[in-house]
């Protein structure tokens, strides 16, 4: 059996940035068109080549295809997003690290400081939002392409992944329980699979995108 090459740093970075956007704000009309585009289909096909990601990608592909069968799909997705990520009742999946007792308080601020980053003043959500973790991982993977920073950035990448994995499984489980149509449940399962896949490469070498 032919072993598929690992994802390139740039590919990880782009996927994390894409997921950060989807978990940060509702999908608008333009975003819905993009979700159903050939470009996204190609990205998912690339991820699907990795056996560890194949099942999660296939599930997300099914949920994206099902959007074409939903009346007012954009409005329905917006309602799903609001119910899952903006409500505070027991049927939500809040995307904040501080909502999960496993996470050390203020960890994301320490990670950002180590990376020389800070949250933009225009960002109106708490700094421990899932999107911030994913943007940080995107930045770190891009930085791994700069050889003089490789060791430091790889160590920080591992710390960020470990911190995220303290609460991401519970977040994903909440999405599974409370997302009736399943798009965000599938998205969270893919995210968890990618983070675990990334975390499994402790001695991450530089892989250039072709």
Curated annotation (Swiss-Prot):
Q: Which family does it belong to?
A: Belongs to the TorD/DmsD family. TorD subfamily.
Function statement: Involved in the biogenesis of TorA. Acts on TorA before the insertion of the molybdenum cofactor and, as a result, probably favors a conformation of the apoenzyme that is competent for acquiring the cofactor.
Q: Which GO terms describe its biological process?
A: protein complex oligomerization; protein folding
SUPFAM superfamilies annotated for this entry?
TorD-like (SSF89155)
Keyword 4Fe-4S: yes or no? no
Q: Does the keyword NAD apply?
A: no
Q: Localized where?
A: Cytoplasm
Which NCBIfam families does the entry mention?
A: PRK04976.1 (NF003442)
Q: Which organism is it from?
A: Salmonella paratyphi C (strain RKS4594)
Q: What is this protein called?
A: Chaperone protein TorD
Which Pfam families does the UniProt entry name for this protein? Nitrate_red_del
Q: Name one GO cellular component term.
A: cytoplasm
Q: Which terms are listed as keywords in the entry?
A: Chaperone, Cytoplasm
Write down the HAMAP family for this protein, in alphabetical order. Answer: TorD
């Amino acid at each position: 059996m032919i072993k598929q090459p690992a994802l390139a740093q740039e590919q990880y970075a782009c996927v994390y940035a894409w997921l950060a956007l989807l978990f940060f704000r509702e999908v608008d009309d333009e975003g819905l068109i993009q979700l159903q585009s050939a470009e996204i289909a190609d990205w998912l096909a690339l991820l699907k080549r990795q056996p560890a990601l194949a099942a999660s990608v296939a599930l997300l592909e099914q949920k994206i295809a099902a959007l074409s069968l939903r009346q007012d799909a954009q409005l329905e997705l917006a309602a799903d997003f609001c119910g899952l990520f903006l409500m505070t009742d027991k049927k939500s999946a809040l995307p904040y690290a501080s909502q999960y007792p496993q996470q050390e308080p203020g960890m994301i601020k320490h990670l950002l400081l180590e990376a020389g980053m800070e949250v933009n003043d225009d960002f109106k959500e708490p700094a421990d939002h899932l999107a911030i973790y994913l943007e940080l991982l995107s930045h770190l993977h891009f930085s791994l392409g700069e050889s003089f920073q490789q060791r430091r950035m790889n160590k920080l990448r591992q710390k960020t992944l470990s911190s995220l994995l303290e609460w991401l499984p519970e977040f994903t489980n909440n999405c599974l329980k409370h997302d009736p149509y399943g798009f965000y449940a599938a998205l969270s399962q893919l995210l968890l699979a990618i983070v675990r896949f990334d975390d499994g490469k402790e001695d991450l070498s530089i892989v250039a995108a072709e």
